C-alpha cells in the first residue's frame, strides 16, 4: 500500500509539473503573439492605416472592405493612384495578380508592354511593403513576397476583358 501511495504522489506531482510547463508555454506564446502584434501595428502605422493613437484611418477602412487579395497592397495601390490611368481591361488583368495563386511551371515574360509596366509597379510596391515589414521586425522574405503575386493569367484576363472567348484565348 505505501508503494501505491508513493506512485500516486509522484503521478500527482508530475501532473502539476505538466500543468506548470503548459502554462509557461502558453505565456511564452502570448508574449510572442503580442510582439508580432506590435510589429504588425508598426507596419500599419508606417503606411498610415492607423495613427499614433492607433485610431483606424480611411486606408484601413478601405482595406477592411477588400475581401480577396492582399489588402495592404491593394489599398496602397489604390491610394497611390495606381489604377487612375489604367483601362478597365488592364485593371481586370492587374487584379488577377492578387487572386491567382497557382504556380506555373512555364513562365514566359509578359508580351504586352501595357501590362508589363503595371506589373513592375506592383512588384516595386511589394518590395516596399516587404522592406517596411522587415524593418518592423516581421519575418518576411522579400523575394518570396514579391513572387507571391502571380502574373501568369494577366494576358488571358486582358483578352477576356476585351471580349474574346476563352475558346479563342486558349
Feature names for model-found ranges:
Residues 1-170:
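Non-catalytic terminal extensions of ATP-dependent helicases
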Amino acid at each position: 500500500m505505501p508503494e501505491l501511495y508513493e506512485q500516486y504522489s509522484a503521478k500527482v506531482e508530475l501532473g502539476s509539473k505538466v500543468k506548470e510547463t503548459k502554462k509557461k508555454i502558453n505565456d511564452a506564446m502570448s508574449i510572442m503573439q503580442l510582439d508580432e502584434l506590435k510589429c504588425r501595428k508598426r507596419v500599419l502605422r508606417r503606411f498610415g492605416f492607423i495613427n499614433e493613437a492607433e485610431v483606424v484611418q480611411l486606408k484601413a477602412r478601405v482595406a477592411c472592405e477588400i475581401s480577396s487579395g492582399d489588402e495592404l497592397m491593394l489599398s496602397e495601390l489604390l491610394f497611390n493612384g495606381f489604377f487612375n490611368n489604367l483601362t478597365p481591361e488592364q485593371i481586370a488583368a492587374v487584379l488577377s495578380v492578387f487572386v491567382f495563386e497557382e504556380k506555373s511551371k512555364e513562365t514566359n515574360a509578359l508580351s504586352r508592354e501595357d501590362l508589363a509596366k503595371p506589373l513592375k509597379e506592383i512588384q516595386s510596391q511589394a518590395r516596399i511593403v516587404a522592406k517596411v515589414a522587415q524593418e518592423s521586425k516581421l519575418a518576411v522574405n522579400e523575394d518570396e513576397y514579391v513572387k507571391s503575386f502571380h502574373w501568369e493569367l494577366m494576358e488571358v484576363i486582358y483578352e477576356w476583358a476585351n471580349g474574346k472567348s476563352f475558346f479563342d484565348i486558349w
